[in-house]
Design a protein with these regions (language model features):
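Positively charged, aromatic-enriched nucleic acid-contacting surfaces
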Residues: 508-512, 554-577
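Alpha-helix-loop-beta-strand connector modules within alpha/beta enzyme cores
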Residues: 130-151, 202-211, 274-290
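Hydrophobic faces of well-ordered beta-strands that scaffold small-molecule active sites
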Residues: 83-86, 119-121, 145-153, 173-177, ...
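Alpha/beta enzyme core
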Residues: 101-114, 157-186, 190-222, 226-285, ...
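A mid-to-C-terminal "edge-of-domain" accessory segment
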Residues: 49-89, 343-522, 558-561
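Mixed-charge, glycine-accented linear interaction segment located at domain edges/termini
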Residues: 574-577, 581-603
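N-terminal capping/small domains of soluble enzymes
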Residues: 43-157, 426-429, 433-435, 439-441
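Catalytic alpha/beta core domains of metabolic enzymes, predominantly
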Residues: 266-397
């Protein structure tokens, strides 16, 4: 809308029929006057200024006590966290059709290949499929030695025992215990006091300890005070300390405290303050791994995770492309590549991101948005002419400075590092494109390096076709437009043959066909090209001057082709361009001249 750009005055409101003058009424429309023009400017839609019922909402988070929080003084994240994929549980439970056993198995192996070393594989007590999946991984020896599986359970004795039972024979695993702690759930769902909620958590810890005491494998405890962000900080600290004291971890095998933004409630910096408060007040901090588990309800899961890492978070749970309940979990791919783009190795192999997206879509039935950070089909695409020109010049600069840090305009990282290409994924051609992007595409994909003026003309031709057809053009279509417009044109004049003699100057005889009639022209000049040019001028009375010529090889090798570009200026002052392609560079220049002349005659 353009109206906010002007100073306006409101004359009045049209009141809903039946409303009293001076009383309360819904605004149907405002008439505004443009103070520059003085006339009625725009009518505004009904109820534009306020949503109903805003008064029933309030801030439902609990900020920690005021203190000096140091995370805000840290400029960047210096190393990658421990990653834990929860795709097979948190992500899978949010799917319309959850993955079957075979899909889960394939997805687990795929996560291992990407480099995940902690993977939550399910809720074994929730269903037979979940239980059998865990057993399949263990019994078929599908868990790599450097990978730890994680299973989740609420703090209920029967469910805990069934969960731990599923781990029989596992070399190492994480048992993830949770119970809700937020003020809302204590009051509305469980009707329990703080002390009773702590007792539930501790009883769960004791049950796990009892079960794993008879197991041979190594079991690490993870505890989540579910809805941490809606829990009073002092109570969150108290229940975390109580769990740590009950479990008695060591520095060698610490307990994982997973501080989940189960539902995002605040600005990201509040979550960071909550994390740092726990980080700096825990009793046995050296025996604890602080884990983050942000959700994306407010669209800020990435920011929460990154600020949470600055605030002391050492581990992050999330999913590929942010799959999960409601608006999803934090996207581990975006987090990892944010680190990568700052020169920090994320420890995950995302070098073929299109394949990762394909596997994700096939396994989950979900789709990756074309604008999803890093993984979307269009995230590196530039349609705008000015953007394409800047990218093309930036990429050219990099070829001249190959050891410089990546700093190409509009590209946060090198698309080739994640399995994308400049020609197919970056420079995209439509009616908004410019000569820079089109020229870059032609040069780097097809080896065609047009003169600057020709490149500008060709850019307008391509944009016009895209605009007329109202669609994007593929690179092959752009190349075909170039060929059809410029290369070896044979109408209205068809070049049949030519030969030369050299006696101080070059003499040429040119055989050609014009509208079905054959001609033979002769001419002479200082060079072959000059001789043919003079033959055309004299023999067909074609007037042109100010010839521009450029040529280069299209390929390498003894049988490579050359391409030539010729521009001629008519008496009208307009320049006409043509191109010739041939294995002989001299012949290519002659064909280019004929192409330019044919375009002049067809104008």
């Amino acid at each position: 809308m353009v109206w906010p750009l002007y100073r306006t005055k409101i004359e009045g409101a049209l009141l809903r029929k039946g409303a009293k003058q001076g009383g309360t009424a819904e605004v149907t429309a405002f008439r505004l006057w443009n103070c520059r023009g003085g006339g009625p400017f725009v009518f505004l839609p009904e109820r534009m200024f306020q949503m109903k019922n805003v008064q029933k909402y309030a801030r439902n988070y609990f900020a920690p006590p005021a203190q000096q929080y140091h995370w805000s003084q840290r400029e960047y994240i210096a190393q990658a966290p421990r990653w834990c994929s929860v795709d097979l549980r948190d992500g899978n439970q949010a799917l319309v059709v959850p993955m079957d056993l075979e899909k889960k198995r394939g997805f687990f192996q795929f996560l291992c290949r990407l480099g995940f070393r902690e993977i939550e594989v399910g809720f074994p007590a929730a269903s037979d499929t979940e239980y059998q999946f865990v057993r399949t991984l263990i019994e078929h020896n599908l868990i790599p030695d450097d990978v730890t599986i994680q299973v989740i359970t609420p703090a209920r004795e029967a469910i805990i025992r069934r969960t731990v039972e599923a781990l029989a024979g596992c070399k190492k695993a994480i048992v993830h215990l949770y119970n809700p702690t937020s003020a809302a759930q204590r009051e509305q769902v469980f009707h329990k006091s703080r002390g009773q909620i702590i007792d539930i958590a501790l009883q769960g810890v004791r049950t796990i300890a009892d079960c794993v005491g008879r197991m041979k494998g190594q079991i690490q405890l993870e505890y989540t005070p579910e809805s941490f962000t809606g829990t009073e900080p002092d109570f969150a600290l108290a229940i975390c300390d109580a769990v740590v004291q009950e479990w008695k971890p060591t520095a060698e095998l610490p307990v994982i405290l997973n501080l989940a933004s189960t539902m995002s409630l605040s600005l990201p910096h509040i979550y960071a303050n909550q994390i740092e408060y726990i980080d700096t007040h825990l009793r046995d901090r050296d025996k604890v791994i602080l884990s983050l588990h942000p959700h994306n309800d407010r669209g800020s899961a990435i920011a929460e995770a990154e600020l949470g890492m600055l605030a002391g978070g050492q581990r992050v749970e999330g999913t590929l492309f942010g799959n999960g309940e409601r608006t999803g979990n934090v996207d581990l791919i975006t987090l990892a590549l944010n680190l990568y783009s700052h020169g920090v190795d994320p420890g995950l192999d995302l070098s073929n991101l299109p394949q990762v997206a394909q596997m994700y879509e096939e396994s989950t039935g979900m789709s990756v948005s074309p604008r999803h950070p890093y993984g979307g089909q269009l995230v590196f695409a530039a349609f705008s002419g000015s953007h394409q020109d800047a990218i093309a010049k930036g990429l050219t600069w990099r070829t001249q400075h190959p050891n410089a840090h990546w700093n190409v305009p509009y590209l946060p990282l090198d698309p080739e590092d994640v399995g994308r290409s400049y020609e197919d994924d970056v420079i995209r051609i439509n009616s908004q494109s410019g000569k820079g992007g089109i020229g870059y595409l032609m040069e780097h994909r097809y080896g065609i390096n047009m003169p600057k003026e020709m490149r500008e003309e060709f850019g307008y031709i391509v944009k016009g076709i895209s605009d007329h057809q109202n669609r994007e053009l593929s690179s092959d279509e752009v190349h075909q437009i170039f060929t059809d417009t410029y290369v070896n044109l044979s109408a209205p004049i068809q070049l049949d043959d030519f030969y030369f003699m050299h006696k101080k100057v070059y003499h040429t005889t040119v055989s050609l066909t014009v509208n079905g009639e054959q001609f033979e022209l002769t001419g002479r000049g200082n060079g072959r090209f000059d001789a043919v040019s003079n033959a055309l001028r004299k023999g067909l009375n074609i007037r042109f001057h100010d010839i521009v010529y450029q040529e280069h090889s299209l390929e390498r090798g003894s049988t490579s082709r050359a391409i030539a570009y010729v521009g001629i200026t008519a008496d009208s002052g307009e320049t006409f361009w043509g191109s010739g392609v041939h294995t002989d560079i001299a012949s290519a220049s002659i064909y280019a001249l004929f192409s330019a002349v044919n375009r002049l005659l067809s104008f």
